[in-house]
């Protein structure tokens, strides 16, 4: 892991707070500016390690994978305050001063520092996808392909309600990270997913149902690697996704986006429902914007974007294969001209 850093001074949040931010990032594959750049936004418990042995999207990104690091320069920022690298000095305690849009603005500043003026694609799941939407609005000509997965351009009332409950747990529980994680797992999965996996079986050695043992495990696992301040911040970002806030109607805001927008929903998602995704897609079509809709079929709910890699690969391959073919074709033409 080689983390690189960008110092951003005097950043003004939507709430009017002035802060200094250390933005960390990793790159994979081709060197920046030598190949098409793909920006990958991580989700609530993720980080910039998107590929490789420890990569959370290693089944999608890597050598000869769907997003081929032999062909693309892959860039991933850490959301400031996510605790990656275990430097507690970079944690953000005043989490309510930040919104998803603030993070998108920080990413834009990071891209500027790296002299990046165009991105072949921005891809992200859940809150990372919400930040991707914000990026597309902030810089309408920046992104060729916008790929928000298991997310939407806004946090719904249902999502806000769950984030509110998460915030209550995080601020009032005696075991906040583990308890909040247990509740969150109920939103990330589905009843049929649990039935298929556990079917009311018991863990005799522990004297509990296997579903309870599984929830306890996930609570402890996150507690051992996550900071409380980080969880509070990420939950706040999830709650504040809204590209229309202070800008006008959805139609007015998205009409300026020049990206091809690939909406990818999950048919069983309880967090960002497929109905909301379809509505978004239909509105984009009505506005005659470049858009495509894909739907992951899964019993696993929201977490399907971290599970159903075969389906995601099938949806994404045409997007990334086309660029590879164009690049190869261009190289061939150049070689032919030189030969002549």
Describe the predicted segments one by one.
Residues 279-281, 285-340:
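Catalytic active-site module of serine/aspartate enzymes centered on a nucleophile-bearing elbow/loop
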Residues 26-86:
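N-terminal cap/lid subdomain of alpha/beta-hydrolase-fold enzymes
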Residues 101-120:
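Conserved acidic catalytic loop of the alpha/beta-hydrolase fold
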Residues 118-157:
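Conserved hydrolase catalytic core segment
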Residues 257, 263-265:
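Short beta-strand/loop motif that positions the catalytic acidic residue
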Residues 142-221:
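Alpha/beta-hydrolase-fold enzymes
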Residues 270-279:
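Conserved alpha/beta-hydrolase "acid-adjacent" motif
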Residues 1-37:
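Catalytic-loop region of hydrolases
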